[in-house]
Amino acid sequence: MLRKIVDRHQDDCPEVIAAQTFVFRVIHLSWLKNAMLRRIATNLIGLVYCLLNCHKNIPILNFSFAYLKRLPSTISLRERIKIARIVLRNTGIYELIRRYDSKETIVVLDEGFLQIVHYLFVYESMAPDIKQVDKLLSQIPIPDAVILLSAPKRVLKERTLARGHDRIKAGSSEAVEAFISHALEVFECLKASPEIRQRLVAVNSCSNVQPFVTNGDQSSDVNRIIEILISGCIYGRA
C-alpha cells in the first residue's frame, strides 16, 4: 500500500514521500540503491541523529533502556540489543524528519515512535504490561496522523505462519497465537489513547478507509490522509 500511495502522489504538492526516501534525499544518498547498504545507512543515520538530539528524548530513552533491563531471562540479550538499536534508530529518524520536513511534503513513516511501543512490549513468551504501555505513550510524540491496517486475527495468524517472523523463535501455531494476541492487546491500548484516537485512520480494505472517531474530534489532517489512502488504492488497482 505504501508504494501505491507514494507512486500516486509523488508529483503532487504536497509531495507524498516514504520516510527512507526522504532521509536519503536530505543526506544526499539517493544514489545508494543496494538494499543491504541502505539498511545499514539508515541505522547509522538514525543513531547519529539520535545522539545529536538525545537531550530532547531523555525520558523516552531512559524508560526504554530501563524496561529492557528489567525484562525476564526468557528475552535474550541479543533480542534486547536489537530492540535498543531500533529505539535509537527510530528516535533519530524522527528527529531528522522533524528538522527537515516542510509543508511541501507528507512523509509516510512506517517505523516511528509507535513502532517502538510494539517492539518494547510485544513478545511471544510474556503478556504486555499495559500500565507501562500507557506510561510510554504519555511521553512519545504522536504523528499528525496514524494509519491502522486491520485484519481478522485468523488472517494475521495464517499470514504469520506462512511467512514466519524473526521474533517468534518457535514458529509453532501456539507461539504465533500468543504473539499475535499480545500484539493486538497493545494495539487496543494504542487505540484507547485520546491523542491517538483523534489522529487515527482505520483501514480495513481499500473500500473501507475512515477516521477512527466520527464525532468531529479527529485531527484536521485525517480527512486529507483518507483521500490520499483511497486514491492510492484506486491507482494501484488501475
Segment roles from a protein language model:
Residues 105, 111-112, 129, 138-162:
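Conserved phosphate-donor/acceptor-positioning beta-strand/loop module used by diverse small-molecule
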Residues 22, 70, 109-113, 117-118, ...:
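Short loop/turn segments at strand-loop or loop-helix junctions that form parts
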Residues 55-137:
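Glycine-rich phosphate-binding loop used to anchor ATP phosphates in small-molecule kinases
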Residues 2-75:
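N-terminal phosphate/diphosphate-binding loop that engages ATP/GTP or pyrophosphate donors
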Residues 27-33, 119-121, 158-162:
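Short aromatic-enriched loop/helix-cap "lid" or pocket-rim segments at secondary-structure transitions
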Residues 6-7, 124-127, 163-166:
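Glycine-rich, phosphate-binding/catalytic loops in enzymes
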Residues 157-238:
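NTP-dependent small-molecule kinase module
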Residues 17, 145-147, 201, 212:
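Hydrophobic/aromatic beta-strand patches that form the interior of the parallel beta-sheet core
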